[in-house]
Amino acid sequence: MQLIDGKAISELVKQEIAAEVAGIVAKGGKRPHLAAILVGHDGGSETYVAAKVKACEVCGFKSSLIRYEADVTEEELLAKVRELNEDADVDGFIVQLPLPKHISEQKVIETIDYRKDVDGFHPINVGRMSIGLPCYVSATPNGILELLKRYHIETQGKKCVVLGRSNIVGKPMASLMMQKAYPGDATVTVCHSRSKDLVKECQEADIIIAALGQPNFVKAEMVKEGAVVIDVGTTRVPDATKKSGFKLTGDVKFDEVAPKCSYITPVPGGVGPMTIVSLMKNTLLAGKKAIYK
């Protein structure tokens, strides 16, 4: 069993980005600039945004954090999005999800200029990704592809089961694992809460990508010997022994599943750090105008 160390790989990628940015700046070019909008005080969102700002620092990017209270109106938020669309200094920006109930996430996503949509959530980026055109690929699936690549994990002709069908992970992940490229060329099955033979599908899978948000859902009896298991779940489970009062728990029952795997990602320290690094990669592409002029 080999542990896929997302933390170590993410540090490596950040150093690669920082070196490229240093080269751009040395030639008189502009530092990539990422802006983030944070609404309210959701614990998970606070943690993620802080990590994104810190990653920008390491990569040599300029970053801006724009904060609103949870009672901000949809109109006020959309006005800020339009302002960032027009701001030539901002290369890419994100609106941290989830948003309060009174704001339509879809409306916000569609208002973002797709050329600055470094989260890869805009329908234009999603559509381009699904037909294999250059675009900003959403961060978590992109991070998983990077891990498969860096560990030289074989995907061609492999049976890959994606657990979960969210727009953020499940659907794009299935599309990417089917693409005519490496990593890809896999035979993909998507399972979800309504699937009938989920356990049987998992037992036959060479690669399982678990993105359900259900702690410890994948158990040893669901995984065949030598499988590759990628755990996208990060649920905060109360834990009195931890200073924060909770521990991050994946969708995979790690201790019992790991011995059967050829490769497995831990939680934390697996997919999470790669998600942030993918956002940095997209921001660098935006700064270089590599995808959209």
Curated annotation (Swiss-Prot):
One of its GO terms (cellular component) is cytosol. Pathway: One-carbon metabolism; tetrahydrofolate interconversion. The keyword Amino-acid biosynthesis applies. InterPro entries: Aminoacid_DH-like_N_sf, NAD(P)-bd_dom_sf, THF_DH/CycHdrlase, THF_DH/CycHdrlase_cat_dom, THF_DH/CycHdrlase_CS, THF_DH/CycHdrlase_NAD-bd_dom. Its EC number is 1.5.1.5, 3.5.4.9. One of its GO terms (molecular function) is methenyltetrahydrofolate cyclohydrolase activity. Keywords: Amino-acid biosynthesis, Histidine biosynthesis, Hydrolase, Methionine biosynthesis, Multifunctional enzyme, NADP, One-carbon metabolism, Oxidoreductase, Purine biosynthesis. NADP(+) binds at residues 164-166, 193, 234. Gene3D superfamilies: Leucine Dehydrogenase, chain A, domain 1, NAD(P)-binding Rossmann-like Domain. It holds the Pfam family THF_DHG_CYH. It catalyses: (6R)-5,10-methylene-5,6,7,8-tetrahydrofolate + NADP(+) = (6R)-5,10-methenyltetrahydrofolate + NADPH; (6R)-5,10-methenyltetrahydrofolate + H2O = (6R)-10-formyltetrahydrofolate + H(+). The keyword NADP applies. GO terms for biological process: L-histidine biosynthetic process; methionine biosynthetic process; purine nucleotide biosynthetic process; tetrahydrofolate interconversion. Catalyzes the oxidation of 5,10-methylenetetrahydrofolate to 5,10-methenyltetrahydrofolate and then the hydrolysis of 5,10-methenyltetrahydrofolate to 10-formyltetrahydrofolate. Belongs to the tetrahydrofolate dehydrogenase/cyclohydrolase family. Homodimer. This is Bifunctional protein FolD. The gene is folD.
